[in-house]
């Protein structure tokens, strides 16, 4: 994270900055560097009341990605030990790597800073795959999530036509 990123984010009232782990060899040196960079980023961001988000990405779509599952993200969060380091819980990536979305959401809700979604397989719109999003959205609401939900998917049709899922999900 650039030193000025948190200043820029604060100037537009942005509350979160998503940082990527990158494609690395899964070495101890890479892990130590990642954690040290997160300590630096969280310290700079905390001066502006900003949260740093880390996102596990599945290894099928992103081979070699350093942070590839929720357990590793939790270990990283614990090691860095900063209150403004949270997890971007991407339902698509978690489903591909580990599944059991609702259990993981319930268990780790205080660690989560943002929830993203797309369906499996293929990172498609929410009404076109194996995840029952109307049910999951209702469950997310019932467990007390007060943050944003972000759609990040690759539409099978035009963007406008792909938004039909909203009527059935809200």
Which residues does each PLM region occupy?
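Histidine-acidic metal/acid-base catalytic patches
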Residues: 13, 51, 67-89, 93-170
């Amino acid at each position: 994270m650039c030193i000025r990123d948190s200043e820029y984010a604060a100037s537009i009232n942005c509350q979160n900055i998503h940082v990527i782990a990158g494609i690395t060899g899964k070495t101890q040196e890479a892990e130590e560097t990642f954690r040290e960079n997160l300590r630096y980023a969280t310290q700079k961001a905390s001066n502006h009341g900003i949260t740093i988000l880390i996102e596990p990405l599945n290894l099928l779509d992103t081979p070699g990605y350093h942070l590839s599952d929720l357990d590793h993200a939790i270990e990283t969060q614990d090691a860095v030990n900063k209150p403004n380091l949270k997890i971007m819980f991407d339902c698509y990536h978690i489903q591909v790597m580990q599944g059991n979305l609702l259990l993981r959401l319930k268990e780790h809700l205080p660690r989560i800073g943002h929830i993203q979604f797309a369906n499996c397989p293929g990172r498609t719109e929410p009404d076109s795959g194996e995840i029952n999003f109307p049910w999951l959205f209702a469950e997310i609401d019932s467990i007390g999530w007060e943050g944003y939900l972000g759609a990040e998917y690759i539409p099978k049709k035009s963007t406008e036509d792909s938004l039909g899922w909203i009527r059935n999900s809200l």
